[in-house]
Regions:
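Active-site beta->alpha loop and helix N-cap motifs at the rims of alpha/beta catalytic domains
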Residues: 1-146
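Generic alpha-helical structural context detector
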Residues: 8, 279, 312-316
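Structural signal for hydrophobic packing residues in well-ordered secondary-structure cores
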Residues: 14, 33, 68, 72, ...
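A non-catalytic, amphipathic alpha-helix used as a structural packing/dimerization or gating element
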Residues: 24-27, 31, 59, 63, ...
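A general structural signal for well-ordered alpha-helical segments in protein cores
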Residues: 57, 61, 86, 174, ...
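Catalytic alpha/beta core domains of metabolic enzymes, predominantly
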Residues: 125-128, 140-295, 300, 304
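C-terminal extensions of enzymes
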Residues: 309-349
Length: 349
């Protein structure tokens, strides 16, 4: 699976009574699907995945899988601390049409951060049995943890571990990871223009076949339905796929170093603004990319500061449904809302 470009960390909308607002989630995903972002990440670390029940997780994954455009890469975050629980979510994600899962270290046992053998066992056991490829999550802030270079290099050799999102990525750390995983080479299926081929694209191609109508079985004329043209695919060789998961405004140096793309928090409420930073670089105009990055820097920093409550209010301002965070997280104060309104005024959504 090709992982690159801008990925959006989806929020989970809640109604005022605290239930998942699935219709609003469906609308949000449909709108993100009209944007030029490459992928959507559900229930990622740092969001509210840990507040969801098992049935809510199943509902959220199902709605996203049904609402997303087929060409958008779908990645499901796993907020479970056991191998069994993680695999249950991976199975749900596969059934919903997702393309990969995002796996972070267990958060219930801080002592694991000092025990590489147990960490390796957790990640490897999930990767062994997961029906979907695994992306690793690394973040030095609680409750997650930054994965050591040695552990990343070990896990990258696993055939079902295809890359990582790194919230602390610097040019130096990226180069160290790239060097440690330089022997990893895999073929992925892409379109004629080297865009990802998702599982839902392949499923649609299998379903679009020529068939004979039921009426023709009664002796009438057969009616053949011509299949849609199949998606033309080719293969591309990729290494261990590394995505930045920090501020959008700091993306350019990482892209210049070779990072495949990014998962910026700001993309949830301003996907177009984040994409323009990436697109300008891909178009060979780093000066324009730097200019675009400066335009979003203040909004970017504020989203990092205010967290999910700030992102959700930003979504409300920019045409998505954010709503309130789920308790015990608090909504923004009036002063904080004014700050978000001020910085998002010039950021394209």
């Amino acid at each position: 699976m090709l992982i690159d470009g801008i990925h959006v960390p989806l929020t989970v909308p809640f109604a005022r009574d605290g239930r998942c607002y699935l219709r609003k989630l469906e609308n949000n995903v449909g709108r993100y699907s009209l944007s030029p972002v490459a992928g959507l990440v559900a229930m990622g670390p740092g969001g509210e995945a840990g507040t969801l029940s098992d049935s809510e997780i199943a509902d959220v994954l199902r709605v996203i899988g049904q609402a997303a455009a087929a060409e958008k890469v779908l990645v499901a975050g796993i907020a479970k601390d056991s191998v069994r629980g993680a695999l249950a979510v991976a199975e749900l994600a596969a059934a919903a049409g997702f393309d990969a899962v995002l796996l972070s270290a267990p958060t219930s046992w801080p002592e694991l951060s000092k025990d590489r053998a147990q960490l390796s066992l957790f990640f490897s056991a999930v990767a062994d049995a997961s029906p979907l490829p695994v992306m690793l999550w690394s973040d030095r802030t609680a409750p997650a943890m930054q994965l050591s270079m040695e552990l990343v290099a070990e896990l990258a050799a696993h055939p079902n571990v295809i890359g990582m999102y790194d919230a602390d990525l610097t040019v130096e750390r990226y180069r160290a990871i790239a060097d440690a995983t330089r022997d990893v080479k895999r073929e992925v299926k892409v379109t004629a223009v080297f865009a990802p081929v998702t599982r839902r694209m392949e499923a649609a191609a299998r379903e679009d076949g020529t068939f004979v109508s039921a009426e023709s079985l009664g002796g009438g004329a057969a009616v053949a339905i011509t299949a849609k043209p199949a998606v033309k695919t080719r293969t591309k060789v990729v290494g261990f796929q590394i995505m930045a998961a920090g501020p959008c405004a700091d993306m350019l140096p990482l892209l210049e170093a070779g990072v495949a793309g990014a998962l910026p928090r700001l993309a949830a409420c301003a996907p177009q603004g984040c994409y323009e930073v990436f697109a300008a670089f891909k178009d060979g105009d780093p000066a324009l990319s730097a200019n675009k990055a400066e335009r979003v820097r203040e909004a970017d920093g504020l989203m990092q500061e205010l967290g999910v409550a700030g992102v959700k209010y930003g979504c409300d301002l920019n045409g998505y449904y954010g709503g309130l965070p789920r308790p015990p997280r608090l909504p923004l104060t009036a002063v904080q809302r004014s700050r978000v309104e001020a910085v998002l005024g010039e950021v394209r959504n």
